Amino acid sequence: MNIEEFREYCLSFKGVHEKMPFPNVPDKYSRDVLCFYVADKWFCFVNIEIFDFCCIKCNPDESGELQTEYTGIRPGWPMNKKYWISVYFNQDVPDEKIKELVSNSYDIVVKSLTKKEREML
């Protein structure tokens, strides 16, 4: 999967928009971060230049199991490691599994929205 395929997949979910939220920070890595939002809440982000991993929300009960099963899934850098995981591309995590995890992340965020926010999607 390349950055355009990944981006297209993330944008395929209802109510999703993208933004590069750190255009003025000093370090280039942060400036190149593309975030995917639903109702202004992040569910996924990725560096568009390096495209080595994505960081996504994850059910805390599943996080440890996933990290045990795949070497390409690690605690979410630089986020709260209880609720976020980093999923590395081109390692042992199949593209279909990455898509499943991104979809789960989207669902976690949607479930956290208010009823009014969900109705506006």
Which functions belong to the PLM regions below?
Residues 1-121:
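Charge-dense, helix-prone N-terminal extensions
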